[in-house]
Amino acid sequence: MKELKHTKSEAMFKEAVKYIPGGVNSPVRAFGSVGLNPIFIDRAKGSKIYDVDGNEYIDYICSWGPLILGHSNEKLYEGIEETLRRGTSYGVPTEIEVKMAKLITEAYPSVDMVRMVNSGTEATMSALRVARGYTRRNKILKFEGCYHGHSDALLVKSGSGTITFGVPTSPGVPEGTVKDTLVCRYNDIEAVKRIFQEQGNEIAAVIVEPVSGNMGVVPGKQEFLQFLRDITKEYKSVLIFDEVITGFRLAYGGAQEVYGIEADMTCFGKIIGAGLPVGAYGGKREIMECVSPMGPVYQAGTLSGNPLAMHMGYKNLNILKENKDVYERLEEKAKRLEEGFNKNIKELGIKATVVRFKAMLCLFFAEGPLNNYDEVSKCDTEMYAKYFGEMLKRGVLIAPAQFEALFLSDAHTDEDIEYTIKANYEALKELKC
């Protein structure tokens, strides 16, 4: 095994902490939960990413999900220079925004209209406002471990970095802001039933990740998601599927296509921007017509629907639309990783569980079942930290936190998969020493 040097990354991090909180612009990038300093990236191509010290890694972060076709895909870049030369932002409408909206609504039968924003956080925040305006109710129901961005109302018992850093509800979020946020255990039908029996007529919306990708990977059970669909209809609440991660990743029609369940509203991000900042929320026409300027619910954004993000997103979605076998390839790769990891775990006698749903995958250092926040939060995070370091030494970059998903791209090769399984075996073997 070749020893990797990180001299330049260490120097850059030392400089970064002088000017940026924690040296990073998003907490998980600091590598703090795995006890290391971050590597700084120079470039990326295909399935590989290269740090400033010249080290090469097989990348399973993939910018946390947007890069389903891999890094620096040439097809995505076709025409981007011309788009750039025409102008980066206008503040008035463009044709590409209409094309992009039409493409999304065609992929999702539950979405009649869609509004572009700049991030997944904006998408979920705006969707809640619209749902409240539409129903004229205030309360919302979310689930422990589901992360819906960092807006105040949703930063309660969240997943992602809030588990990693042990801050389930962030300081700086006033109690008054979250007094109307109800929280239930994920995959727990009886708990949801009790809340609706007590407060159902006050609940504006239920927001859920159909497959949670921010407490590792925890799939919503079919019967659980169907129950949410049924009970929200009964009480005339809005069912919001947060598909920022799952949208256009599990299938071209996302989780709703896979489960066969249609939400009232859907939030998008990541893949619809192909690596550029973007988000969107959409839903039934009668709900979306509440949004300004058609209706009274205000939401706006200077850079929403900007030409560069729309160009990349439109290209990305069209490639996926015309090449839906991408999803079969992604699932096959994920399945091979799952089988390889499980074989290694069994052979070495490691207490770990691999959870896979379609092409979403996570290795938990805990024994299953893992169906909710309480079960997932018992993972051995110290063991994961050691595992991360051993994989990094072997040139495999995975999430620097136990509670994040492993992301595959169409650029990952058979050789990448085989090498990763081999590296996994060696890393797990080191943990036993």
From Swiss-Prot:
Gene: hemL
Family to which this protein belongs: Belongs to the class-III pyridoxal-phosphate-dependent aminotransferase family. HemL subfamily.
Gene3D superfamilies registered for this protein in UniProt: Aspartate Aminotransferase, domain 1, Type I PLP-dependent aspartate aminotransferase-like (Major domain)
Gene Ontology terms: cellular component: cytoplasm
Places the protein is found: Cytoplasm
Record SUPFAM superfamilies: PLP-dependent transferases (SSF53383)
Principal EC category: isomerase
Stated name of the protein: Glutamate-1-semialdehyde 2,1-aminomutase
